[in-house]
A protein has these predicted regions:
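A generic structural signal for alpha->beta connector loops
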Residues: 51-53, 76-78, 116, 153-156
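Rossmann-fold NAD(P)-binding glycine/threonine-rich loop
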Residues: 123-163
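Residues at secondary-structure transition points
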Residues: 34, 38, 62, 82-85, ...
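A glycine-biased structural micro-motif
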Residues: 27, 65, 90, 116, ...
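Active-site phosphate/pyrophosphate- and oxyanion-stabilizing loops and adjacent acidic/basic residues
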Residues: 69, 108, 145
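Rossmann-like NAD(P)-binding element
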Residues: 74-118, 122-131
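NAD(P)+-binding Rossmann beta1-loop-alpha1 motif at the extreme N-terminus of oxidoreductases
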Residues: 2-73
Length: 163
């Protein structure tokens, strides 16, 4: 697993005394599972442009490689494309940006690779038909709560839930 920032408090230690303390994450690799879609690719682009190493993941590694090449060419960043499991294993923080229809299954398949990592879930539980998008019910309450339930060994946070 990628190492934690050297200035981070030890696991299980009390929080830093300074409430404004933040670890230096400038060298940490960010993974984007679902990085070939609009939202995942857009966030990968922004992180690469900011200088973070990025790994784009996809069920189809060749699509991930093509997306990574596009993002790297546009940003000059360190961007690689891999399969979803390899993406999850290569990154310290991993964004989940897959369609809700594949959310639970993807998380279940990646649970071991995501253990101990920060997982950022940006999935909105939406379905689509001829009339457009509609909200889907989620037994766990929200997509992020579903992710937290499936990924009990990860630190799950919710972000980037724009529609």
């Amino acid at each position: 697993m990628p190492s934690q920032p050297s200035d981070a408090p030890a696991a299980g230690a009390a929080p830093a005394p300074d409430p404004w303390w933040l670890p230096d994450v400038s060298g940490l690799t960010v993974g984007v599972v679902g990085g070939t879609g609009e939202q995942g690719r857009g966030l990968a682009f922004r992180w690469a442009a900011a200088g973070l190493p990025v790994v784009i993941g996809s069920r189809d590694p060749s699509r991930a490689a093509a997306a990574a090449q596009e993002v790297a060419a546009a940003t000059g960043g360190d961007v690689r494309g891999l399969g979803n499991a390899e993406c999850a294993a290569a990154a310290a923080a991993v964004l989940i940006a897959v369609p809700y229809a594949h959310h639970r299954q993807t998380l279940m398949e990646l649970a071991a690779d995501l253990a101990g990592r920060i997982v950022i879930d940006c999935v909105n539980p939406l379905g689509f038909d001829a009339h457009g998008a509609y909200v889907l019910g989620v037994p766990d309450g929200s997509a992020a709560e579903e992710a937290a339930a499936v990924l009990s060994g990860s630190r799950v946070v919710a972000a980037f839930h724009h529609v």
